[in-house]
């Protein structure tokens, strides 16, 4: 949508004969800016996260009021034909920016960049990460103490606001809608994951698992189907799940594995992870569809300036709707891919062509989350094999019995058991679709990659 916006703002006008045709009702709904629905300001985790770093206890009401004022100011200022520039929007929407300075912010305190420098189990297949965490337990616990207020704030947000509904500023201001401080979520998670290992190592297994379960439920909240997430939210959830999965994999390789496997709450944790596995794919599809439709918010002033005809826009909407419907059913079907390639062939309007060629569906967001889910499922399968003591010779049949849980949705290839390496793997994965933590350990070359986890020898 950002690329489309810049292209539209930068192009000069040209004349297209307007047909005497009405806009499709669905198109009119998409392109018409609307006043803010104030009901969406209530009990909304998006607003809570947006204001989570505001230091005062009334952070939610303050943020809600500021967002509403900025939205209303932009809405009232929207011209019929021309578009507001980013400079004009910044001069109009002032209330949220004021919050950064008037009362101060809750900021992540890590002056020595411990979390950034010490990747710990954030590094893919680091066989020593559990020991490294235990060696650094005093630094980890100090980090938690220094950030106690910020951590409590985010705990409160997810406890009090289970549902998120992303709100965008109207029309061209949509690309300038402020977003939550996602880096805080990641930093807090990394510190709490490391502390869960410390707790388990100290014999406080209940507390360690409770921390892990809290984080898994937090991720699950971010991919609930009953909410309207933006695409960034969904991708952040996938990144958080990858980190958690790597910690679980490391714990299953550690000296604490048997104790965890016998703990009922650890079983509850692993089952909670399957809620994420069931929801991440459809949630990503919904977010992609919403992101794709956001491109239409730009087209009302373009229609008014006669740079685009009603016929062209109606036809383009129908084509994109066909594509989106196929993606919702089976995005990896050859028919869908063929339609993607052919969608732009009959599109002649320059503005529509730019949006068509930069389709959000082709960037790889869905593939990244599906590959992450593959890794997540591998860790879950590893847990099941260890929990139920599946014998090596029975593992191939066990994997087959798990159905889609052991099949990559992109290639439809099954996971493979290698008895010599004691690994479950998936080969032929594109580097660009791997989670960021895994890409760090693999060379970016033309060769397809192998995703895998290793089953330790019998406990």
Feature-to-residue mapping (PLM):
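Classical Sec-dependent N-terminal signal peptides that target proteins to the secretory pathway
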Residues: 1-18
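Short acidic linear motifs
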Residues: 14-459
